[in-house]
Design a protein with these regions (language model features):
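Boundary-flanking segments of nucleic-acid-binding domains in nuclear regulatory proteins
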Residues: 1-268
Length: 268
């Protein structure tokens, strides 16, 4: 007697001859792949769960259980498709003016709706506390999309307005220090900028009234140290909104700590 095939499951064979079972489902005219599995029984379970999710409003984003067979990412995709009528292959759920990107049960990130196209085609990965995407073959921290440097420290270089480190909507992120070696601080009620450069230990280059001056001071300090024989690949600051002549004028007039001129390779 011929064994009955499982609904929504298709048997295939991999290049090495290993059997594989693909599960898929069609909903609202959309054919959705649910994944490939090594056992037909597992693929059948995934199809059944997908069918229930799509045809029952009793399932919500918080309904996922560890003993479910369907992968969590696919679970989110189906909930969003059922509720919003838009299928997105990444685990995204659309809200009115923003969307959430779900990394695991109970952990999701918020983004502005204008970032939907990017995150629909770029998968977010998590390693420890580091969140990144694969972009053109390299790992790109999601903070870099806001102009936040890889060495930036939360609370010192940037902060979240509502104290929620999972809320990446633009209005919630304030960048305090955009440039390498520059730190913002308050002095007598005024915002100032301190420039620090590291050669074995930290050297204070100076304190400045503007962020641009502080950034250029870092570059000037690096030039002095390199001229003194310090062999280090200093990460220079690119200062926006300044013409070459404006940059040169500020560079020449800026005062830096005299100590920098005494730092030599044999003393560093």
């Amino acid at each position: 007697m011929k064994r009955k095939k499982s609904v929504g499951v298709y048997h295939t064979v991999l290049k090495d001859g290993t059997p594989s079972y693909r599960a898929s489902i069609t909903f609202e005219g959309k054919h959705i792949s649910l994944g490939s599995f090594s056992e037909e029984k597992e693929a059948a379970f995934v199809y059944k769960e997908a069918y229930k999710i799509l045809h029952s409003n009793s399932f919500s984003l918080s309904s996922y259980k560890e003993n479910m067979h369907i992968p969590y990412e696919k679970f989110v995709c189906l909930i969003n498709f059922r509720d919003k009528g838009m299928y997105i292959s990444n685990p995204i759920y659309l809200e009115k003016k923003y969307f959430t990107y779900h990394l695991e049960p109970g952990l999701f990130l918020k983004f502005d709706i204008e970032d939907l196209f990017y995150y629909s085609s770029h998968k977010i990965m998590k390693r420890g506390s580091h969140l990144f995407v694969a972009d053109y073959g390299s790992q790109l921290s999601i903070l870099q999309r806001y102009g936040i440097k890889s060495y930036a420290v939360e609370g010192r270089d940037y902060h979240f307005v509502n104290d929620d480190p999972t809320d990446f909507r633009y209005e919630n992120i304030v960048i305090l220090n955009r440039y390498h070696g520059v730190r913002q601080f308050a002095e007598k009620g005024f915002i100032k900028y301190k420039t620090v450069i590291h050669v074995r230990s930290n050297y204070v280059v100076g304190k400045y009234n503007s962020e641009a001056e502080a950034a250029i001071a870092y570059n000037k300090a690096a030039d002095i140290l390199i001229k003194n024989g310090i062999k280090k690949n200093f990460q220079m600051n690119y200062v926006e909104d300044l013409s070459p002549s404006q940059y040169a004028d500020i560079y020449m007039k800026l005062k830096v700590s005299p100590k920098l001129f005494r730092v030599r390779a044999d003393h560093a």
